Amino acid sequence: MDFRANLQRQVKPKTLSEEERKVHGPQQVDFRSVLAKKGTPKTPVPEKVPPPKPATPDFRSVLGSKKKLPTENGSNNTEALNAKAAEGLKPVGNAQPSGFLKPVGNAKLADTPKPLSSTKPAETPKPLGNVKPAETPKPLGSTKPAETPKPLGSTKPAETPKPLGNVKPAETPKPLGNIKPTETPKPLGSTKPAETPKPLGSTKPAETPKPLGNVKPAETPKPLGNVKPAETPKPLGNVKPAETPKPVSNAKPAETLKPVGNAKPAETPKPLSNVKPAETPKLVGNAKPAETSKPLDNAKPAEAPKPLGNAKPAEIPKPTGKEELKKEIKNDVNCKKGHAGATDSEKRPESRGTAPTFEEKLQDLHVAEGQKLLLQCRVSSDPPATITWTLNGKTLKTTKFIVLSQEGSLCSVSIEKALPEDRGLYKCVAKNSAGQAESSCQVTVDVPDAPTSENAKAPEMKARRPKSSLPPVLGTESDATVKKKPAPKTPPKAAMPPQIIQFPEDQKVRAGESVELFGKVAGTQPITCTWMKFRKQIQDSEHIKVENSEQGSKLTIRAARQEHCGCYTLLVENKLGSRQAQVNLTVVDKPDPPAGTPCASDIRSSSLTLSWYGSSYDGGSAVQSYSVEIWDSVDKTWKELATCRSTSFNVQDLLPDREYKFRVRAINVYGTSEPSQESELTALGEKPEEEPKDEVEVSDDDEKEPEVDYRTVTVNTEQKVSDFYDIEERLGSGKFGQVFRLVEKKTGKIWAGKFFKAYSAKEKENIRQEISIMNCLHHPKLVQCVDAFEEKANIVMVLEIVSGGELFERIIDEDFELTERECIKYMKQISEGVEYIHKQGIVHLDLKPENIMCVNKTGTRIKLIDFGLARRLENAGSLKVLFGTPEFVAPEVINYEPIGYATDMWSIGVICYILVSGLSPFMGDNDNETLANVTSATWDFDDEAFDEISDDAKDFISNLLKKDMKNRLNCTQCLQHPWLMKDTKNMEAKKLSKDRMKKYMARRKWQKTGNAVRAIGRLSSMAMISGLSGRKSSTGSPTSPLNAEKLESEDVSQAFLEAVAEEKPHVKPYFSKTIRDLEVVEGSAARFDCKIEGYPDPEVVWFKDDQSIRESRHFQIDYDEDGNCSLIISDVCGDDDAKYTCKAVNSLGEATCTAELIVETMEEGEGEGGEEEEEE
């Protein structure tokens, strides 16, 4: 048959039944397919044959053109060779088993092997089979003796040729292969590749040749077949020794032995490929390749050669003893050392070389989808190793998507555009005859939204690469699949999310100094850098400049001022994620001058009391003291009189014949302020009764104005309030607690003690937040907190006492004369107090008549109280609240829109409207009607009460009661409004009717005592907002609302009223939205969001692997008024890979939800993955 077609298909082992093998037994089969199965390297395309090596010339062209190949002695006549067959050639089966027989194996070629047929006439070998003497078999080929083994038929004629079969020892037969005459050739069996025997025609001389059969080396060398050495040598065809030896081929005895190259394709096997025609050896006889020597032509020198007799049973029918032959092929090894038949090469174990080792191992890699994936490692071995790449246990091959490259010792896998299917465990296996080694790494392919995406299982890998239909070839796969491509000089960097690798700490600078905030970034470009303050992006301006580059971003403030104080955030983003860092900037300076004009009171013959306001801005550091300066009409120079800590001072030893002026400076650690405005010229010795009534606003008939030290208060948990104060009568009570009169034991000063009921940690935290805000509000128009104590279920705030009662109660008093002039004085003080609050970045959010207190019962001085609902706007961004009193609350609060400083201005407008008219602009018959009036902003001046009110007053009110908060006046504009700038001393004092005010106050009192006032929670009945609560603290939890409990009807009983709210039904905590699993890249930010329902408002605690989390710059917890709670983890690292739990607790129970954070680390791991199972 023509077996050339077999070159294009793979031989499948064990596919023919025994009957089929018998039918095909006489046929000659292409044995090159068998060689390919046992280690012959494959080419990338089976049809493509690698270029010939010099040592293995292609002889196919000779088969087509030259009929006969001349031998080295010049004779090209095969008949002459056959003529002497009777003298020298012995039958295969008659050879002696004593060891003189040289099997047809692959031996070293240092000496020129003898040809099979080109010898002297007396030594001409006989044909191996039953061949007619007239014909002579062709030689197997001729190769260079110094490099590769020579063919069986191309040797010098002077030496005795070796027959293919077993010949008698008298002639010292030569083996079929190229063997040195002095060395014992190996039998024709197949040996383990670890011995690195070389094929018949192309092996290195230094390697041990393989025998033609599977024969144990310690025994007598076996002939071409698998024959036991102790018995009569078997022929090439696995024949029992007792029988007549069979010829090498399965040709009939009557037929003539035909050479390999000169026979017709149907009868003769095709020649070996990749061999030069001049050196092509001829097969001796029509022997079956499976049972005779196989030509090992296409094997690389470094790879295991294939024995001559290992044909696959699917193609080659086997004679008797097939099962035994299979066992021998699998188990037999080369000849044992020391045996007479062993070669010198076998006795040198060091010839095996060194096992592969990885000088540079594979490293774990992160790449972004669509970017280049490159894995590299460096392998050293001798002989060179076979490289195999696998992904998740599947062998990789070169495709148009994947390039496998090997440049010397550098091996690489390159994928131009990585896809999710390319992630997984990559393994590189290096294998040679001396052993094998492997290295592995994990590759992750990230999608662009990986930092914020929720955790999901990796999608199944789609089969992007074409699957090969060819079975793997063990040991030689890389030769067929690896393209050799020079590795790039510098491997591309793996894609990385942005990193802020350098960032300044919190800074404190002096006013006027320049500030540079620089954040150094790293990561995959492009990286976008944005500076923000109060969650608003900072743009270049006259004083601020932002400069961005690939190295980072710099924010420069040329001359720092007060408005530049705050928290600055640098946000860096790229397509792989984002990261942010914060720095607090404090601009410190000497304080602003004390506000307003110092005022003299209690003027006597040689003394007076001087009072003044605190600084509107303390310069970033608390005011430590005040310096009082005096000027008299004689010296006419300013001198420092004294230094004190409070905002009042009793001036003594004044001379009656002089006039005096005073001014005050504020002092902090950074310096002394400019002087305040000068007081009016004051003379002594005047009659006290002639003192102007103007002094009424700063004096009290019974006692001096209490001197208040501005203190930064911390809650004292070690001592009790009774240790420092005597607790006297109760001044008032409410659901929040009670108010008592306190007398300080040390000084005898009178204070008000507000005793809060605080059973839970959240309630205590709410009160601490109020104290913290009051520490920032040191101003004469704001009530001061001077001390605080925490006891078991109570927190006590020691407050400056204001004994004049509520403003509106003071107005309707019978001895009080209400004019527009008094209204101006009150509104001016309210505006001054709120202006200071706003300058500190705080909104009051509960401005109403109950929270405006008169200092005494006779004057017009007032103070603002109750900062329990106050909020910081500095770092709150878009703040929304859901509390207030319906009559005074702004529309944006009801509509649950972002609030601002203008929210307080609306309340000021409502207070002013009521103050001048005694009417409420929005009060309805019920809360729903009131809230509807507020949201529609419907009001007017049509009532006759406004007939007596000036146009300036109406304009003032109109500019505050604007529905759009952007159009409302701010406090500074209010103080500059013509109405508040009027000269109250000289203006007309027209009395206003107090009847409407009395009716209004009666209604308000009925509402408070008759359980009629409700919080914004009633909006739910209007289908506008649901779940709105009453008073809440700055952390978003409501305080206890006031119930119908009536307050004491004492003069100061209205002094500390809570926001009135309707009781909500109590509900156990539950999560209307739970946190979900996250998967983020290291260095980015992670955010868990949930929404918590329940009343009383639950306390929230976050846990990381059952350990509670404390808020820090790394862990930030947000909990707003609507129950939305978030945990933000900035700059995520591997340690953050954990289970996170949010726990909500109130008095009715608790609820939890849990999620997992998976962090894809960017660090390059050196550890190798687990070993894969051995490939079959």
From Swiss-Prot:
GO terms for molecular function: actin binding; ATP binding; calmodulin binding; metal ion binding; myosin light chain kinase activity. Residues 1-354, 448-497, 673-707 are annotated as: Disordered. Residues 319-721 are annotated as: Actin-binding (calcium/calmodulin-insensitive). The modification Phosphothreonine is found at residue 1039. Residues 100-291 are annotated as: 16 X 12 AA tandem repeats. Its main location: cytoplasm. The modification Phosphoserine is found at residues 202, 699, 1020-1021, 1033-1034, 1037, 1040. The gene is MYLK. Residues 356-444, 498-586, 1069-1158 form the Ig-like C2-type domain. The lineage of its organism: Eukaryota, Metazoa, Chordata, Craniata, Vertebrata. ATP binds at residues 731-739, 754. This is Myosin light chain kinase, smooth muscle. Residues 594-686 form the Fibronectin type-III domain. One of its GO terms (cellular component) is stress fiber. It comes from Bos taurus. The keyword Cell division does not apply. Belongs to the protein kinase superfamily. CAMK Ser/Thr protein kinase family.
